[in-house]
Amino acid sequence: MNEKEIKRLTSLHIKKYRDEHKQFLIEGKRIIAEALESGADIVKLYSASELEESIITAANDHKIPIENVDERLAQKISSTVSPSGVLALCSIPKKD
């Protein structure tokens, strides 16, 4: 992952940039599993920890790339105090 991508991901903590890029981050295994089940538009998964087999299978079924990142980088991208090490980049759905 290059520095430009890291900056873009960390910028998504601010609403202005979420609106500009039309993307947002979700964090945690459970919420990512729920997003996959509901058909959310997940662009990419980032993992610094072991993913559950069900998440890997669902990501592969939806052709979602999974990028392994080190824990330090996951903490930098995360907006939580104690990050789970699993993040997903999602597209904001278009309003009808």
Task: Tell where the protein language model's regions lie, with residue ranges.
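Glycine/small-residue-rich loop that forms an oxyanion/phosphate-binding "nest" at active or ligand-binding sites
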Residues: 59-94
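A short, well-structured juxtamembrane/interface segment
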Residues: 29, 94-96
